[in-house]
């Protein structure tokens, strides 16, 4: 297949190139265009403008994978409009191009944050009513809605079953792998310094997405006849912060320092921290200890598999081991 990947030089894009280059012909669309093994050519966004001359010379693509976007800023320092300009605006541009192109498949990388900042119930599923909080999630759901609106016909029914075009909206939870540090690296550095984890009394569960599992799913969507739709993406097993710390210590060859300090006492300290504007406050405690489990049952059923190829703990360990390299 001829595949166009936007944001091809980012973390996910680079891993997709490694996973797909042996069986497919890959092209990029990005703001930078360095030489990359396995990529025939990287185009600029101006090249897909309907008025541009290069657009007339673009290859005939079979599939488009849209990765380009502005990542979630955990420090909240980004201007809100930037999220909409990039996450929503670029999606509109590339999806319009897809509809006019010969490509048959479109994979859009959204996020679970487009649906919910917190999970109500045992797991986050595709039928949840989206209630994103903050410009990152809001810009992602706006992009999703643009795609869905474009797929509506005159009778206001979704044309998701059009055999000529198949559209997939992927909502992965936190993606990790060698080369992508993120929040896992922040926790790793705390553990590496020997700082005890005082919240061991909170046995929270969170879902993660191994980059290897993600590449496996994308390959499946490209090569199998999977129904168009919205699919959540995550590893099979959810892990607690205590389990993450234990895995990190195992990788470092040291004993974990997990303190199970009284839960009520820690909640009281966090409440006091809110009043006194201290680093540990009620909101930060909630973020550190809440459950965020994402169901991957729908995507597994669509691909006809019972399990993801990589266990959550194995994927996390692979990422952790890369931190010391």
Where are the regions that the model predicts?
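N-terminal Rossmann NAD(P)H-binding glycine-rich loop of SDR-like oxidoreductase domains
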Residues: 3-23
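NAD(P)H-binding glycine-rich loop region in Rossmannoid oxidoreductase-like domains
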Residues: 47-89, 93, 97
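Conserved Rossmann-fold NAD(P)-dependent oxidoreductase catalytic core, especially the SDR/UDP-sugar
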Residues: 93-135, 155-156
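Amphipathic terminal alpha-helices
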Residues: 298-300, 306, 310-325
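Conserved C-terminal active-site "lid" loop/helix of NAD(P)H-dependent oxidoreductases
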Residues: 211, 246, 269-306
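Catalytic helix-loop patch of NAD(P)-dependent Rossmann-fold dehydrogenases
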Residues: 85, 120-175, 196-197
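Substrate-positioning beta->alpha
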Residues: 180-186, 200-222, 228-229
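Mid/C-terminal beta-alpha module of Rossmann-like enzyme folds, strongest
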Residues: 224-280, 316-320, 324
């Amino acid at each position: 297949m001829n595949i166009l990947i936007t944001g091809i030089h980012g973390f996910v894009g680079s891993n997709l190139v490694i996973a797909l280059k042996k069986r497919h012909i890959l092209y990029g669309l990005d703001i930078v265009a360095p030489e990359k093994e396995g990529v025939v050519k990287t185009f600029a966004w101006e090249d897909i403008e309907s008025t541009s001359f290069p657009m007339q010379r673009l290859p005939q693509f079979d599939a488009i994978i849209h990765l380009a976007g502005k990542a979630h800023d955990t420090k909240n320092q980004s201007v809100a409009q930037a999220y909409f300009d990039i996450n929503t605006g670029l999606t509109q541009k590339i999806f319009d191009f897809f509809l006019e192109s010969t490509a048959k498949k479109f994979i859009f990388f959204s996020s679970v944050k487009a649906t919910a900042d917190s999970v109500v119930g045992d797991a986050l599923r595709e039928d949840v009513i989206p209630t994103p909080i903050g410009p990152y999630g809001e810009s992602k759901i706006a992009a999703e809605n643009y795609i869905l609106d474009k797929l509506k016909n005159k009778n206001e029914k979704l044309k998701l079953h059009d055999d000529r075009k198949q559209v997939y909206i992927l909502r992965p939870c936190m993606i990790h792998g060698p080369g992508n540090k993120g929040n896992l690296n922040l926790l790793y550095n705390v553990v590496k310094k020997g700082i005890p984890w005082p919240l061991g009394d909170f046995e929270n569960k969170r879902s993660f997405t191994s980059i290897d599992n993600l590449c496996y799913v994308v390959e499946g969507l490209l090569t199998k006849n999977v129904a168009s739709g919205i699919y959540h993406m995550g590893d099979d097993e959810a892990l607690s912060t205590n389990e993450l710390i234990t895995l990190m210590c195992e990788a470092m060859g040291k004993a974990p320092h997990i303190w199970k300090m009284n839960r009520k006492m820690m909640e009281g300290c966090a409440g006091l921290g809110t009043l006194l504007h201290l680093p540990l406050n009620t909101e930060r405690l909630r973020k550190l200890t809440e459950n965020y489990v994402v169901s991957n049952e729908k995507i597994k059923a669509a691909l006809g598999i019972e399990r993801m190829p990589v266990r959550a703990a194995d994927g996390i360990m692979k990422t952790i081991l890369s931190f010391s390299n």
